[in-house]
Amino acid sequence: MIFLEFAELCSRLEKISGRLETISILAETISSLSDDDLPHFCRLILGKPFPEWSGKKLGVGPNLLYEAVAYVTGRKREEVIDRLSRVGDAGAAVEELLSQKSQTSFFTVELTLADIMAALIEISGMEGGRSQKEKVRVIQRILSSASPLEGHYITAILLEDFRIGVGEGNLRDAIAQAFSVDPNLVEYANQVRNDMGEVAVLARKGEEALRSVRLVPFHPVRMMLARQGTISGVLKEGDPVAVEFKYDGARFQFHKQNKTCRMYSRRLEEVTNAMPDVVALLDEALPDDIIVDGEVIAVQGGHPMPFQTVLRRFRRKHNVAEAADAITMIPNLFDILYYNQEMLIDLPFRERRNILTQVASRYVTPQLVSDDETEIEAYYHTALDAGHEGVMLKLQGSRYTPGVRGKDWVKIKPEADTLDLVVTGAEWGEGKRAHVFGSFLLSVRDDDRLVPISRVATGFSDEQLIWLFDTLQDDIIRKDGKMVYFEPRLVFEIGYSEIQKSPNYEGGYALRFPRFIEVREDKDLKEANTAEDVEERYIQTHSSLNT
């Protein structure tokens, strides 16, 4: 596929608001692609050139882009920065600059989808002291051959700011329509393989190929998620439920095969080297050829420590042994996804739990099975007294659904009004905070868009503000007076006293007395709260006030 065709399709899709029309156009394109182009297309149309499990990262920030665009267009770097700041959208700004470039590129070639993917793979593999310069050279090379429209979408992909109105749901249905297969099977295959590119290739082969997908060690899948709820609400399902401690730690997946062990974070990043002590414990406790799901907690003096302690270990690259000696890390296992060449996610939870207790010699989380609300509440208070967050209620007949926040797992913890919001902008501070950001613009997810809902200026320590200022420098994509706007990457946990209707924000709601609690480095943008979540909370709160 010629990349210009891809760019023209993206431009067309951006202008379409109807879901069915989007799916129809995608399906027509997908059905016409070659086997080689099909996986590339399905990854790039989502703005994600690599599967989450691959570990590949582009690591291209605005500063690298400024340098490459300045070279290709024959402009000064400051002119490029000014244009991007004024236009607001980096892709649109690069399109403008390429259409006005003052020098002619020689030896340009017609770019294909495969060319762009090859360049992205090349960029992702660059490490070391010269990697930044090498990345700039690759970006210069592809932009030199790009038309203005191609440059628009190359930029959006490089900055991971690709929003054309196509999400996984639309792509799933388009793949199903293109190859006349059941969309539920496409969804199932993507849960297992976590790669729409691979799933599209399987769908072309037919429904049996989709049904036959299997988990593979060292190919992590998204972790099953829980929704908030109540004990009484879960018990209405009628059957006894499994009750487990909800730990204040960091989620992980542990894979072991042929005596090789790897550990992955909630975001599917490998953390094996950062957690050698935990890996050693699990290696000793578990047999070969296995994938388990769990949560690791930091313990000091017999009591659990805040989960930030674990996250600091996940990020650590140096002095790991000293950190491991300083604080004890304890893994807690609560599910098993694969064992002895058998995928287990389709088994009922009670059966998975039985297998886990049989094969793991240690570290399986305690469990109560009950349909008695009083007994479950007592267990909940036992968890709180032990320093844990609360309890998890799990339906015993439920399958493991990777990446899904459904009704089968419910978390019960003390009432706290918090939201996980995406940081999309900031305003310079005043007084003693004049050299850092003083407040932050926060947004919720609304389909593939981010909609502002609040600003937050309280709850930060001076050290946190300095860290955030340093961390967010390379994410700035636009400046407007005292405001700066970021390529969305960080998620804040925000406390608040009330959700109010407000005309001041696009979503129609605002937070009263918002306060910063912490950076949720364990969560990516897909796990931030949605506009629908906010509306539901508003309705629930005001319904209870009126009864």
UniProtKB/Swiss-Prot annotation:
DNA ligase that seals nicks in double-stranded DNA during DNA replication, DNA recombination and DNA repair. GO terms for molecular function: ATP binding; DNA binding; DNA ligase (ATP) activity; metal ion binding. The lineage of its organism: Archaea, Methanobacteriati, Methanobacteriota, Stenosarchaea group, Methanomicrobia. Keywords: ATP-binding, Cell cycle, Cell division, DNA damage, DNA recombination, DNA repair, DNA replication, Ligase, Magnesium, Metal-binding, Nucleotide-binding. It comes from the Archaea. ATP binds at E244, R251, R266, E295, F334, R405, K411. Its EC number is 6.5.1.1. It holds the Pfam family DNA_ligase_A_M. InterPro entries: ATP-dep_DNA_ligase (IPR050191), DNA_ligae_ATP-dep_bac/arc (IPR022865), DNA_ligase_ATP-dep (IPR000977), DNA_ligase_ATP-dep_C (IPR012309), DNA_ligase_ATP-dep_cent (IPR012310), DNA_ligase_ATP-dep_CS (IPR016059), DNA_ligase_ATP-dep_N (IPR012308), DNA_ligase_N_sf (IPR036599). CDD domains: Adenylation_DNA_ligase_Arch_LigB, OBF_DNA_ligase_Arch_LigB. Belongs to the ATP-dependent DNA ligase family. The active site is at K246. PROSITE patterns: DNA_LIGASE_A2, DNA_LIGASE_A3. This is DNA ligase. Its cofactor is Mg(2+). It comes from Methanospirillum hungatei JF-1 (strain ATCC 27890 / DSM 864 / NBRC 100397 / JF-1). One of its GO terms (biological process) is DNA recombination. It catalyses: ATP + (deoxyribonucleotide)n-3'-hydroxyl + 5'-phospho-(deoxyribonucleotide)m = (deoxyribonucleotide)n+m + AMP + diphosphate.
